[in-house]
Amino acid sequence: MSSTLSNEESGLGDSNRSTEVDGGDGGNFTAYESRFQSQRFDSSFSNFDSQPEKESDLPCGDSSPRPETQSPPSINSFDDTNDSILPPPSAMEKEEGFALREWRRLNALRLEEKEKEEKEMVQQILEAAEQYKAEFYSKRNVTIENNKKLNREKEKFFLENQEKFYAEADKNNWKAIAELIPREVPVIENRGNKKKTATITVIQGPKPGKPTDLSRMRQVLTKLKHNPPTHMKPKLPSPSGADPNVSVSEQVTVTEKL
């Protein structure tokens, strides 16, 4: 390459020859003579004019482009031989921005922390439930034992009173009857600023809120008291020397006559 440039420079130096020209005023002027003379330009133009026009030989209707003037293939053209550079839209993944990726990361951490807190809360609830069940069953067992003990004491007291009642019923019938009748006393209402407390319990009747009417029972008992039947009359002690075969009514009649 360097040798070619040096040859061209040397040729140019030879072609440009300097000659001194004597001027009319007595001055000398240096003129440069080139080897490329004007007749070469004339000959080149004459040759250009003498060449036949090849384009005139082509038919007018031919629109096929010449091989040297063909345009390059379009970038967006889809040929069978040239595939597209980009993949199809269905295979392309949507690009996520930094904000969306950061939100997804923070959301995943938040969900993980929330799930951990929920598991801890559920565990605490289960432990509290187990503790409550244990306390409930222990209190229930204590209450059952106390109720059993109280019921045994009540049963014992009831049996003792029942035996005592049947032992004294033959001696005093009216006292036994009075004990069988419930004592009904109206509720005492406390007036003033004192706290209202029911000091006496009222035995309710068959209808809620209404006491049992015992007036008819009182009438029957009063009638029986004034005119008792034979088996309810008290037995009088038999006098000494009395006939044991004599009935009680006859003995009462004898005593009245006396």
UniProtKB/Swiss-Prot annotation:
Coiled coil: 105-164
Compositional bias segments (type: Low complexity): 34-50
Bias type Basic residues, positions: 224-234
Cellular compartment(s): Cytoplasmic vesicle membrane; Membrane, Coated pit
Region (Involved in binding clathrin heavy chain) location: 90-152
Single GO term (MF): structural molecule activity
Main location: membrane
One BP annotation, GO: vesicle-mediated transport
This protein's record includes keyword Nuclease: no
Modified residues (N-acetylserine): 2
Keywords: Acetylation, Coated pit, Coiled coil, Cytoplasmic vesicle, Membrane
Segments of skewed composition (Polar residues): 1-18, 66-79, 246-258
Chain residue ranges for the region called Disordered: 1-96, 224-258
Membrane topology: Peripheral membrane protein
Gene Ontology CC annotations of this record: clathrin coat of coated pit; clathrin coat of trans-Golgi network vesicle; cytosol
UniProt function note: Clathrin is the major protein of the polyhedral coat of coated pits and vesicles.
Family of the protein in this entry: Belongs to the clathrin light chain family.
Subunit structure comment from the entry: Clathrin coats are formed from molecules containing 3 heavy chains and 3 light chains.
Protein name: Clathrin light chain 3
Origin species: Arabidopsis thaliana (Mouse-ear cress)
